[in-house]
Amino acid sequence: MIILNATKFCIATFLSNLGDVIYSVVIAWYIADVLQSGFLMGAVLFSLGLSRFIAGLLCGPVIDRIGAKLFLWLSDMIRAIIVLVLAILLWDHTISFVILIMVSVLFGAIDAFYWSASESIKPRLVATEYLSRLNSQYFTVVRTTIILGPLIAAWMVESISIEHSLIAISILYVFSTFLILFIDSKNSHLENMNDNNDKTSYFSDLRLGFSFLNRQKMIFYLVITMFFVNIGANGVNVLFPFLAKNVSGDAKYLGYIYSSMSMGSLLTGLIFSVKSIHKVELKIIYLSFLLQATGIAALCFTQNFLIILIFVFVIGLITGFIGVLIPTFVQRSVPIHLLGRVNSIMMAISMLSTPVAQFIFGVSVDYFNIKYLFFIAGALGIVTSLSSLLINERKGTPRETVM
């Protein structure tokens, strides 16, 4: 039953995330091809990111009170309805600026609830010793959709029109909700909550999540470290197109770079899908950040494309390892009745680094040599991870909380 629950969760995640990726590509193409507005593209991305950040800070107490499974189901069902309505509107009309912004705000908020609920439900599906495997399977599923989604979206737009593509996306969300319904809920969150939660207000629950992070300094330092390291790690995604252009001027080389990164991440995910990590320490996480940042900085020292691909593949391997370590550490260290609050706050702060990185490195490309920017991105991660390592060694690694 435990394996079956985890399997249904991973398949539902695959369907839901595949719908997300295809939707993002389809809407981006619609804006570029039909509306032809760079301003609208920027406004849609900004509203999506802003609403995701705000909802991420606020959604935790609600997930902890009502339960992660319900929010997974609601998130996919609401998205299915929204996308279907967009498809209907497109039959005879052009989607207006206001509607696209409203949908972006809704999708951003729903994403925050969905991803926080996904992280919160995992400890209820498998025993603690199998958490790293489930996190690896989850990571592998998400990375796979990121690879397949754009290819499927491109085929859909060319072959069956945007309207039919949106209907297909809606069907993916519906299938996901169907699987979520059949996840066994006898170990649901409501049975693991503190009795006092029913007597507290939403705002006191929200403060409890922030106060927990404030008390658990090592987890708080991890969140801050993630923010700054991710600025460098996300920044390289802005730099990769310019790197490919400098090396060859051929667009296919950019595809090779992204494929190399994805293959590294997938390999790590596959390895730890069958091999459990029994002990996760902050020291290992920070060392992984350090190796990742060193690999990024090393890209400034070579123009040989084969060596670049090897470095990028290794960076992908380490990124995949980090993607398994962090959720496993948090799930083992945070009491189960606080997971929604802590995960939502961590997600919001971590995701904030993406637009910051895109802005900083996007603007910097016009003024600095690309190899210096890779060095700066890596140096930021190196300094941050080394500082966190020193703080961790001085204060000692926190013990994992037994749930």
Regions found by a protein language model. Name each.
Residues 8-24, 48-61, 67-82, 99-157, ...:
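Substrate-agnostic recognition of the 12-TM MFS/MFS-like secondary transporter fold
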Residues 97-102, 108, 133-191, 255, ...:
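Hydrophobic alpha-helical transmembrane segments
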Residues 81, 85-103, 279:
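Short, flexible, glycine-rich and Lys/Arg-enriched loop motifs at helix boundaries
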Residues 47, 57, 65, 69-71, ...:
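C-terminal transmembrane bundle of multi-pass solute transporters/carriers
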Residues 32, 88-95, 307, 316:
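Helix-interface capping motifs at the ends of transmembrane segments in multi-pass membrane proteins
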Residues 1-3, 186-223:
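Juxtamembrane intracellular "pre-TM" segments in multi-pass secondary transporters
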Residues 35-37, 93-96, 158-165, 301-306, ...:
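Transmembrane helix interruption/hinge and helix-loop junction motifs
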Residues 1-51, 211, 215-261:
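Helix-loop boundary and gating motifs at the non-cytosolic
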